[in-house]
Regions:
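Terminal and linker regions of secretory-pathway proteins
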Residues: 2-523
Length: 523
């Protein structure tokens, strides 16, 4: 697919950051001295920087941590949460940063599996208006092109304060909607920053929305429900209704093709059967798109009516119908109590990190420590941004058409991972999307991702190797299954949901160490 117009757009905007907007490049004003109710922090800097080319009031918040281990001084990780419109502090506080909440309190404790032990780590609240970032009114960012241009321009300004990071080995990592952000950001950075090329080594997409929308939603939903029928408490007649829908809609044939290794050819994905990418839900939010469409299906007849005859969802709406059915069963007492689409094993006792974040980061003393005084009430996710960007036309070209070029022509490694308990963006849709992608002269993986990886060894040379970097031995627990070919890796984590590090911080630490930062040469 031709991405020339997109890159030309970025190249035009790349000149904007060179305007004399940044009056001072003294980073000391961003130094974080301490944080209330927190153990000692690694050296860090936080605050807001304006987006060059935007009018006053559009500023992006960052929190930068210095590498704790000098052996990883050459590594620079940039972390993005998704949403769109969710703060990167969700990742920082949720399992990959140096601090986390102590149980269900807002007291902070040290995280022994912080990625700051593996490199310099930058958390960015983008697009403007996300988390501690600010935005003008009316909301100025309405397209993916704008998001990309803003971030690229902002990052160039960021490097004027922290120029030593510009020469590091850069790894862009994120989850969920960051599966769309990261391919565009990477393409723009490698195409536009020609005078001072960045050494971008890899992209990591966790439970990301990077693939074909139908493939990652309706096509894969029935198969996921079958694989998790017991956990989802699905009656046999309801499961049969979804099985029949898969056959009627041709989804079973699509998935059968994806189970052939290597693929026999391009897999035809039905054209977006639900008339939009997929329903997006967030904790403590009502549905942003098509909220009135839910018919609360309880019976087989209700399910069939929603799948085949909904005037809201469109034809073959297995994804939205599944979400509605499981939600309805949960509310009615026959399903999973307090059902969470992000992790089907969550229940009513699960700690709500977003609520704790809202309480802690709304404190005036915390905001003063992070140099964002006067922000007022903090929200981890911004529903205005979510509605604005998900209601906009899909990004063109799609993210999955950009990734192969970055891997093939730019030699940038691509690491994809999923948690098995994520229903929002389930692993079956991810695996289908990988098998339908062509890079470095071949389509998909040639063998099924069934090699084992382990708690402290995310990239064993072979499944019988018992001397991995984490000191693995015969009693070490299996963490999941994986594969890698031609510069692309895929890991499926057992016992994890949408945010893998929230369930499996130790395993994700090994993943970043072994796969992202320490990947073998020749990828």
């Amino acid at each position: 697919m031709n991405i020339g117009p997109f890159l030309f757009f970025i190249q035009l905007l790349w000149s904007i950051p060179h305007l004399p907007i940044f009056k001072s490049t003294n980073a000391s004003r961003f130094k974080v001295r301490s944080l209330p109710d927190s153990p000692a922090l690694p050296t860090s800097w936080a605050g807001r920087l304006p987006v060059p080319g935007r009018k006053d009031g559009n500023e992006i918040f960052f929190w930068l941590f210095e590498a704790e281990n000098k052996a990883y001084d050459d590594t620079f990780i940039i972390w993005f949460n998704g949403g769109p419109g969710c703060s990167s502090l969700v990742g920082l506080m949720g399992g990959n940063g140096p601090i986390s909440f102590d149980g269900n309190s807002t007291l902070l404790e040290h995280n022994p599996y912080s990625w700051t032990q593996l490199g310099h780590v930058l958390y960015v609240d983008q697009p403007v208006g996300t988390g501690f970032s600010t935005a003008s009114n009316p909301y100025p960012v309405t397209t993916n092109e704008m998001i990309t241009a803003d971030f690229v321009a902002w990052l160039n300004g960021f490097f004027t304060y922290f120029p030593h990071l510009q020469s590091k080995r850069i790894h862009l990592m994120g989850e969920s909607y960051a599966g769309i952000y990261i391919p565009y950001f990477t393409a723009a950075l490698v195409e536009s920053n020609t005078s001072h090329p960045l050494d971008i080594r890899s992209m990591s997409l966790g439970d990301g929305s990077w693939g074909n929308a139908a493939a990652m939603s309706s096509v894969a939903m029935g198969a996921y429900m079958r694989s998790q029928a017991t956990a989802l408490k699905l009656p046999s007649d309801i499961l049969s209704a979804f099985n029949a829908a898969d056959q009627s809609c041709g989804f079973d044939d699509v998935l059968a093709q994806a189970q052939i290794y290597p693929p026999k050819g391009k897999i035809n994905i039905p054209g977006n059967p639900e008339n939009f990418n997929y329903r997006r839900r967030r904790r403590d939010m009502t549905d942003v798109l098509n909220a009135s469409c839910s018919i609360s299906p309880k019976t087989v007849a209700d399910v069939n009516e929603s799948i085949f005859n909904s005037t809201c969802y469109g034809p073959c709406a297995t994804y939205s119908t599944a979400m509605d059915y499981v939600d309805t069963a949960s509310a009615g007492g026959t399903g999973i109590p307090c059902f969470d689409v992000y992790d089907i094993h969550h229940d009513c006792s699960t700690i709500d990190t977003l609520t704790l974040m809202a309480e802690y980061f709304s404190r005036a003393d915390v905001q003063a420590a992070l140099h964002v005084s006067g922000r007022g009430t903090y929200g981890a996710c911004n529903s205005t941004i979510l509605g604005t960007l998900l209601g906009a036309p899909s990004a063109v070209p799609p993210a999955y058409s950009i990734l192969p070029n970055l891997v093939t022509e730019r030699s940038i490694s691509l690491h994809i991972y999923n948690g098995e308990w994520d229903m929002l963006l389930n692993h079956i849709g991810t695996e289908l999307s990988i098998q339908n992608m062509t890079w470095r002269g071949a389509q998909g993986f040639s063998t099924k991702p069934q090699q084992l990886f382990y708690v402290d060894d995310a990239m064993p040379m072979n499944s019988s190797d018992m001397t991995g970097p984490g000191g693995r031995n015969a009693t070490t627990k299996v963490a999941g299954n994986w594969a890698e070919e031609r510069g692309v890796s895929y890991h499926l984590f057992r016992g994890a949901g949408h945010s893998v590090f929230a369930n499996k911080p130790r395993e994700m630490f090994a993943y970043v160490r072994d796969v992202v930062v320490g990947a073998r040469n020749g990828w």
